[in-house]
């Protein structure tokens, strides 16, 4: 069958077990429809963004290309989902001074006990489980994607490791004036929450392997390598020390 690209679907109904689709290129009928849409392509800046000084460049995650396309100087990345963490790492590895506002996004292993974690979860039936069978269907629908990366042939992201190497981590953005940015004192809580999900995924794989007597390499115990201390709370940042803010919210 031909593939038509750039089609805007305006309306979709089902009638007599048939789907009827209205688009900007006419009407179509189908026996099956796969809905694979989302809002990740729609910018969602924090309302306080309007208060930033005009000399600071503001861009959204979808506008980011690489470090060379940005003005020289420190960068604040707001949001620690997949885009935020990957962009922060990319800039950090290009020797830019990076500040990352860390939210409640969870993280995941990339490889564990000899396989890609997605492979394990698929074998365990996780991706085949209907929404209604989850403990909390509503939260599953709205859950943020776990952060990891395809960089270096695919690997996990440990923000604690980046902090040891020099990335500046802050809590969730709380207040913003023309002079400074205030962050919530929740960095430890957010890092612990991400690690909790990370360890829970590993534990579920361990249980599956044990239950099904599967031969697999032994897993290592995760131990946090860094903790925020009183002198690195990172709850305030002066706007004069920033060149760019990237919104990954």
Question: Where do the PLM segments sit?
Answer:
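Flavin (primarily FAD) cofactor-binding/catalytic cores of flavoenzymes
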Residues: 1-249
């Amino acid at each position: 069958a031909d593939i038509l690209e750039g089609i805007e679907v305006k309306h979709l109904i089902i009638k007599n077990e048939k789907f009827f689709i209205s688009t900007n290129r006419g009407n179509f009928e189908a026996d099956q429809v796969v809905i694979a849409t989302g809002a990740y392509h729609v910018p969602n800046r924090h309302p306080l963004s309007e208060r930033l000084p005009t000399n600071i460049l503001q861009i959204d995650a979808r506008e980011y290309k690489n470090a060379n396309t940005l003005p020289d100087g420190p960068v604040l990345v707001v949001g620690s989902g997949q885009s935020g963490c990957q962009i922060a790492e990319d800039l950090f590895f290009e020797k830019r001074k990076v500040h990352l506002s860390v939210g409640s996004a969870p993280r995941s292993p990339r490889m564990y006990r000899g396989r890609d974690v997605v492979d394990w979860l698929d074998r365990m039936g996780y991706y085949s489980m209907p929404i209604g069978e989850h403990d909390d269907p509503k939260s599953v629908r709205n859950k943020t994607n776990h952060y990891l990366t395809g960089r270096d042939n695919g690997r996990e992201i440990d923000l604690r490791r980046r902090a040891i190497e020099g990335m500046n981590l802050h809590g969730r953005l709380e207040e913003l004036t023309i002079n400074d940015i205030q962050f919530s004192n929740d960095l430890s809580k957010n890092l612990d929450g991400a690690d909790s999900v990370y360890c829970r995924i590993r534990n579920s794989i361990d249980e599956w392997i044990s239950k099904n007597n599967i031969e697999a390499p032994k897993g290592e115990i995760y131990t946090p390598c860094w903790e925020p201390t009183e002198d690195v709370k990172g709850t305030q940042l002066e706007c004069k020390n920033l060149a760019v803010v990237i919104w990954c919210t």
